Swiss-Prot record:
Autophosphorylated. Autophosphorylation is reduced in presence of the Xanthomonas campestris effector XopAC/AvrAC. Uridylylated at Ser-251 and Thr-252 by the Xanthomonas campestris effector XopAC/AvrAC. This conceals conserved phosphorylation sites in the activation loop, reducing RIPK kinase activity and consequently inhibiting downstream signaling. Its EC number is 2.7.11.1. InterPro entries: Kinase-like_dom_sf, Plant_Ser_Thr_Prot_Kinase, Prot_kinase_dom, Ser-Thr/Tyr_kinase_cat_dom, Ser/Thr_kinase_AS. The gene is RIPK. This is Serine/threonine-protein kinase RIPK. The modification O-UMP-serine is found at residue 251. Disruption phenotype: Reduced leaf width. Enhanced disease resistance to the bacterial pathogen Pseudomonas syringae pv. tomato. Compromised pathogen-associated molecular pattern (PAMP, e.g. flg22)-induced oxidative burst. Mitigation of the higher virulence of EPD1-deficient V.dahliae. Residues 87-367 form the Protein kinase domain. The keyword Transferase applies. Its main location: membrane. Induction: Induced by the microbe-associated molecular pattern (MAMP) flagellin (flg22). Induced by the Pseudomonas syringae effectors AvrB and AvrRpm1. Induced by 12-oxo-phytodienoic acid (OPDA). Down-regulated by UV-B.
Amino acid sequence: MAVKKKVSWRSLIVGCLGDPETLMASSKKPKRKNDVIKKQSSFQRLSILDMSNPSSNTLSEDLSISLAGSDLHVFTLAELKVITQSFSSTNFLGEGGFGPVHKGFIDDKLRPGLKAQPVAVKLLDLEGLQGHREWLTEVMFLGQLKHKNLVKLIGYCCEEEHRTLVYEFMPRGSLENQLFRRYSASLPWSTRMKIAHGAATGLQFLHEAENPVIYRDFKASNILLDSDYTAKLSDFGLAKDGPEGDDTHVSTRVMGTQGYAAPEYIMTGHLTARSDVYSFGVVLLELLTGRRSVDKKRSSREQNLVDWARPMLNDPRKLSRIMDPRLEGQYSETGARKAATLAYQCLSHRPKNRPCMSAVVSILNDLKDYNDIPMGTFTYTVPNTPDNKEDDGRVGNKPRKSSHHHHHQQQQSNHPRSSPSPTTKSPSPTAKSPRNSTENHRRTLRNGVNSPLRSEAGGERY
């Protein structure tokens, strides 16, 4: 729960990349005398750091200085080859905007002080500067922020042109994978509320840190789950320092994922902690309904989840229409009503009307303990209609690729239930199961780090 005092990474990022977002925003503000002095001093530091060239000989040294006191390990490429068996295809987990991800295992003999453990090794594709910036941002944030609901960054490699990140391995993969895989066992109500509470706690920690952080890319595929379904936020490539002093927001280029980004952020580029609250409301709505934030396979009026479901969230008589049918009625009605009301508030078009994350965490903490869940055994059959056919992990005639670290190879899910487990009919032995198909492990949930507003599950880019 403790956070190590952050050295300011802002000057480091600016030195590395020229930070066009921040520079553009600051140019719009009235220049005060003190501002000019500070900027001159800042630019003197930039010329020293000057990490705009990813192959800079001083990059590794600058990072080591900036992250002094952190417990990050700086791996060599040779060590990573040992950990991943030379990046063997048998250890391949997936590939996304950052590049391929491999599972690995750190032996306790690799180096003193590093315990034996499974890891996920993400290799960055450095063809574009954008990727380097996200890699650097992730190292800086996760190197200094420590919390049980943030994924642990164990270390990194910055050797010649190679850029890698080494994370703790998350055996349950992402919430996106657990919630939307067609043939996976349905997440029970209690587990969904546990995940929502954990993810909300992670956001609260970021917003209330000594130097507040705006996550900016909160979505189901960025919520990773350990073996006990503890939620941990991952992928800090788009994270930003919160507003400073009397500023009410951060002005920045619009980036994120369609269906999750707050409407005022899309319209104005003004980013606040309440922008994250809106995104949380979308994920909470996904947990309630079992639907994606954007689903082009549905009818036109139901493709955007928020537009379709939000009007019904505040009406108890209509709530049952939007609840995930795979829950088969086994959820707390009182808890569902309170969760729906919370989602409604988080999704307000007026940022000031959204609750802060501490209030969200408090409400969800109570919801975890509701035990008025109906008992009984049910069978839910997936309708075999054209609208519900799985797309076999393909977009057009091309197979999708799996998201990077978010989609670790999945273990068989045995979800804990607070009531007898309903039986879900399995596909016939002759049917092709997406779980076992190669394409299923190569889905791309991020359409590239260079997209201003990335699409999710087939959504349109802005």
